[in-house]
Structures are given as C-alpha cells and as structure tokens.
Amino acid sequence: MSNIWHDINPRRISPEKFMAVIEIPKGVKNKYEMDKETGLLRLDRVLYTSTHYPANYGFIPRTYAADNDPLDVLVLCQESIVPMTLVECYPIGVMKMIDDDQVDEKIIAIPFNDPSYAEFKDINQLPQHTFSEISHFFRVYKSLEGKKLL
C-alpha cells in the first residue's frame, strides 16, 4: 500500500509549486489527520466550537515543520475538496501563530485550477474579510478545549 506521506515524487514539491494533500474540506467541523503509519485518514476530533474550517486544510508531503509534522496548508478554493485529494498549488503567503507554546505556521495556497482565485499571487491581495475569517477561526477553534492560540 502506497503512503502519500513519503511516497510522492520529490520533484512534485518545490517552493513555487507543490502538491497539497487535503485532509479537511472547507465548511466542516470534523478534524481529520493522516495516520503516518497507514496513510489513512483518522478522525482526530469534532471541533468543540460552532466554527468550521474556513478553507480546505491539509499538508505538503515530504516537508517538516517545527512540530515534526509536515507543513500545514490552507488551500483557498471556491469549492470544498474531498479529503485525500492531491491539489497542485502555489503559495501566496504564510500565517504564523503560537499553538501550545510552539510556532505553528500555515502556508496559504491557491490551486492552479480554480479560476476564482487565479488572480491572487500574494496574501496581501486577499480580501480583508477572507483573511479575517481565517485568523478568527484559528483564534477560537480550540477555545472550548481549554487551549490557547496566539
């Protein structure tokens, strides 16, 4: 059984263009994570708050962040993307936050094949409300779990 975590060709991952693996579609409260051993999705939890994911959320294979997990990525798209879908993206920026006293960076990316977002090349070009929704989500989504994010 192939495992996208480590079996994807490294030439498909570069700073300018990469394949993102979607774990969580936008608009849901279920938090899925890929099981590193099996390569399958597992339900981590249902969010405790009434908030839902404001964008498709996943990771960039063959990368590592400070938390020893792959780099997190939010893929802005007009549609929800089915979990475990590979999406060819380009980065437009990064959101930095602190989660459990650790730096937690989220790459903000655009799929090459969504005409609604094709004009955005930099995070500063996003509508302020889009940025505010994403920021708000990450400030509050763990609040009822007793965890603090900055």
Regions found by a protein language model. Name each.
Residues M1-L150:
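Hydrophobic N-terminal alpha-helices or hydrophobic patches in metabolic proteins across all domains
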